[in-house]
From Swiss-Prot:
The lineage of its organism: Bacteria, Bacillati, Actinomycetota, Actinomycetes, Mycobacteriales. It catalyses: a 2,3-saturated acyl-CoA + A = a 2,3-dehydroacyl-CoA + AH2. This is Acyl-CoA dehydrogenase FadE12. One of its GO terms (cellular component) is cytoplasm. One of its GO terms (biological process) is fatty acid beta-oxidation using acyl-CoA dehydrogenase. Its EC number is 1.3.99.-. It comes from Mycobacterium tuberculosis (strain ATCC 25618 / H37Rv). Transmembrane segments: none annotated.
């Protein structure tokens, strides 16, 4: 029997082709124009939802496509490869959609998933705090009972696209009744709830999706705002973080493909002497090396998505972290080499590559830093002792 595990099915190939064909109508110029005008990519988002791309991973009974993380990461990669990588793709359908689909009540699924799937509703995700980045055990946002209600108080930072969201999935800590200890808990908070506010963080990123500080000042929520069980929030949280890493890797792979495409088109035609500069090994070899690295990262991303969709949570966690690391490194080098290959033109607005430099660099920091990935691999894959 022929092993076809590295060959995408006809359905996946058709999806990839459909996304690439559609998103080409928008592209990098659209993305940059929206970013520089401080406007949202509303048309792109709405059409992605209408075509079924946003909810491809969500259950069919709630308006989704009934596929998996592989298909959603494929959509993300092709959008990024066209120069239109959207952070909210990582957040709304991948993290939040996954968590609610797996652990939400029937009412929560009916309320939130159809809108997430068709793009009419966007849900942000809030975990990071000023003093709690990589160490989620230091989260200080608290949720206390008041009758049947919950009262949420705390502050979050570097929250993507909150100004576009109708709700946000907040990671807080609730008090265990027997011991009094604080434990993680997940809550869906409407962004128009009294006591909920946010302010933008000025970033050196050319992106239509902005970053925000979020303040929860005694936000009152009904009992059904709690997602899943109070005593199982860690497992619920990590059910969303593996998709986050897979989607981050897919985005980085797409960015690397885009940068290489622009560079290759340039060096094929640019002449300094008698031949195109792409004929010279000083340019050809670095670009070839970048292409190899991006393709390797893509394979690891596909492996991670496949393991996740098959329910292998441990295997998916290892592969997702490796994919995120490999893709971030590959895309950063690809963007840098693209700029170098194009010389001064690589830094102009006309070619649109330099604007990706901070976005590619971001992939090495978020959603998890390269150092924390290396810690995970050292400790989990290699069995080395922890330093913290």
């Amino acid at each position: 029997m022929t092993d076809t595990s590295f060959i995408e099915s006809e359905e996946r190939q058709a999806l990839r082709k459909a996304v690439a064909s559609w998103v080409a109508n928008y592209g990098h110029e659209y993305y940059l124009d929206k970013a520089r005008k401080h406007e949202h990519t509303s048309e792109l988002w709405a059409e992605a939802g209408k075509l079924g791309f946003l909810g491809v991973n969500l259950p069919e009974e709630y308006g989704g496509g009934g596929a998996g993380m592989y298909e959603l990461s494929l959509v993300m990669e092709e959008m990024a490869a066209a120069g239109s990588a959207l952070l909210l793709m990582v957040v709304s359908p991948a993290i939040n959609g996954t968590i609610i689909a797996k652990f939400g009540t029937d009412d929560q699924k009916k309320r939130w998933l159809p809108g997430i799937a068709d793009g009419s509703l966007t849900m942000a995700f809030a975990i990071t705090e000023p003093d709690a980045g990589s160490n989620s055990h230091k989260i200080t946002t608290t949720a206390r009972r008041d009758g049947s209600d919950w009262i949420i108080k705390g502050q979050k930072v570097f929250i993507s696209g909150i100004d576009q969201a109708q709700a946000v999935l907040v990671v807080g800590r609730s008090e265990e009744a027997k011991t009094g200890k604080l434990r993680p808990a997940l809550f869906v908070v409407p962004t128009d709830a009294p006591g909920f506010s946010y302010t933008p963080i000025e970033m050196e990123l050319v992106s239509p999706e902005r970053q925000f500080q979020v303040f929860l000042d005694d936000v009152r929520l009904p009992a059904d705002a709690l997602v899943g069980a109070e005593d199982a929030a860690i497992a619920q949280l990590f059910a969303g973080l593996n998709p986050e890493r897979i989607m981050g890797a897919a985005s980085a792979v797409g960015m690397g493909r885009f940068a290489l495409g622009r560079a290759v088109d340039y060096v094929k035609t640019r002449k300094v002497w008698s031949t195109p500069i792409g004929a010279h090994q000083g340019l050809a070899h670095p670009l070839a090396q970048c292409h190899i690295e991006v393709e390797l990262a893509k394979l690891m991303t596909q492996k991670a998505a496949t393991l996740y969709d098959h329910g292998d949570d441990f295997g998916a966690a290892e592969a997702a972290n490796m994919a995120k690391y490999a893709a971030a490194e590959a895309s950063s080098r690809a963007v840098d080499q693209a700029v170098q290959s194009m010389g001064g033109n690589g830094l102009t607005k006309e070619y649109g590559v330099a604007a990706m430099m901070t976005s590619a660099r971001l992939a090495r920091i978020a959603p998890i830093s390269r150092e924390m990935v290396l810690n995970f691999v050292a400790q989990t894959s290699l069995g080395l002792p922890r330093s913290y």
